[in-house]
Amino acid sequence: MNANPKFLSADARVDAAAVAPLPNSRKVYVTGSQPDIRVPMREITQADTPTSFGGEKNPPIYVYDTSGPYTDPDAKIDIRAGLPALRQRWIDARGDTETLAGLTSEYGRERAADPATAELRFPDLHRHPRRAKAGRNVTQMHYARQGIITPEMEFIAIRENQRRAEYLESLKASGPNGAKLAAMMGRQHAGQAFGAAAFGANEAGTNMLTEITPEFVRSEVACGRAIIPANINHPETEPMIIGRNFLVKINANIGNSAVTSSIGEEVDKMTWAIRWGGDTVMDLSTGKHIHETREWIIRNSPVPIGTVPIYQALEKVNGKAEDLTWEIFRDTLIEQAEQGVDYFTIHAGVRLQYVPLTANRMTGIVSRGGSIMAKWCLAHHKESFLYEHFEEICEIMKAYDVSFSLGDGLRPGSIYDANDEAQLGELKTLGELTQIAWKHDVQVMIEGPGHVPMQLIKENMDLQLDWCKEAPFYTLGPLTTDIAPGYDHITSGIGAAMIGWFGTAMLCYVTPKEHLGLPNKDDVKEGIITYKLAAHAADLAKGHPGAQVRDNALSKARFEFRWEDQFNLGLDPDKAREFHDETLPKDSAKVAHFCSMCGPHFCSMKITQDVREFAAQQGMSEDDALKKGMEVKAVEFVKTGSEIYHRQ
């Protein structure tokens, strides 16, 4: 199925499921130093602790929210108009950009003038593209290196902290046991951060960073250890950061192909992905109407959008890689930069000398972009135009603040090929290209594998940190085994959690359809939830400040049999509630002190609570209560004849 013009021109509507607030949640905004710095978060309301457990108040939990205005009941959502230009005033105030009279890319102008695409196009070019003024650099890295803290950096600092300090203060004020409760709920295991600066040199917990400040954000961007993907032509985006010293982020891939999916379906996938926690979205469309699909997605996306420009360039030469030219690729970069793409995957590290190294692989070259460039190199027997024109690409990137995502075109497609000479040779080249981009103050992250068994994952991370000078690592998984088609979200989730712990800044999700087909909405959600789990597990393992707050809150709710809070504090409240209700559907089961796993008589948490209640009644400690209970049972055993078994 391809795009439906009538649907897009007249009847485009947002997916109703994507705009419904999550249970017991509401959108809140934290205001920064100026009124238009309004940082969104999701507030999850909790019930009071039952009287039998002390009856204290449980204040709301605040969690990172990527859903943009879509889950705000007060927002007016019309995907035909796009989202509000959140960052426009900040961009204007810097005075270093100019508004263009219209599109400057040749292909962009052709599409705008083509009557055949009129009904497909996003309604009107309501915001003319912008570009840096002559001689100016508009990247967040450039500002950071000038010592400037931008509104984007302040926004990010507030967002990363998730109102953790306010939450702990609200616990302290909750009653006579408030201080004790705050200490309990704020407790966190010391992490092992493998040298990440935000977590201090001492893994025992001293000298740890306890709060993300705007200055810390600036310093991390300035040194290249983090990036803020925020094209000046995507003012709708809510600023976020990708770096090993911040919360681990996840990316969701969407995009049509030549045989399936429409523009409307891809917009729905985007809104669905960000509802469940996608921090960025990559549009990997390879079918018809790539330009129009991307415009609809960007104008309606509150998260950064990434692309692989070589895919569209290939479409322009009818799929013949050898016919690609620098001029076609350059025009494609400008076309997409003017639309507002925030980061480009560019496979400039695929060099002619590395291609023969893949000959003895089990699975050869599995990256689409990598195979395109390898074919071009062999056809022309020269270095790729991406490598030869890299400095010119940097000039384009810094005129729009597009970040590099330097592609791993020679990543392993099987664990057999992991960490081979081709993969590592390309990685070393990516480190060299990073230094060139940084000379231009262009932001860079590095893409990584792929398929890697667990014992080789840390080597990947260590080499990347060394050769790429701590530029953020962005990995696809890695998949830790090749035996589970249909379950590769799990095989890769294992590797993702590990490499996130070791220092990867962003994890590219894998869905159950990996290697099998184009994912639908259900697959997108499954991949997102799996990777949110992996990212959170990595944050916990690193000891990221406040990472354990949500775990502690859910564990407390579980022990107190606050079922609704258990559902709502989880990553997927809908599935948790569905599983519980399969066996205990009645409302009365939502307050029961057991579930269907153990039943009312064998619930370990209920037994623990009975011991505590007995101890309180007897005026003794829990240890003494357990000892007393054992003595009583011993007397009963002797009185009944010291028989292990009794007939009923």
Curated annotation (Swiss-Prot):
Binds 1 [4Fe-4S] cluster per subunit. The cluster is coordinated with 3 cysteines and an exchangeable S-adenosyl-L-methionine. Keywords: 4Fe-4S, Iron, Iron-sulfur, Lyase, Metal-binding, S-adenosyl-L-methionine, Thiamine biosynthesis, Zinc. Its EC number is 4.1.99.17. Substrate binds at N253, M282, Y311, H347, S367, R368, G369, D408, G409, L410, R411, E447, Y474. It comes from the Bacteria. Belongs to the ThiC family. This is Phosphomethylpyrimidine synthase. It comes from Burkholderia thailandensis (strain ATCC 700388 / DSM 13276 / CCUG 48851 / CIP 106301 / E264).
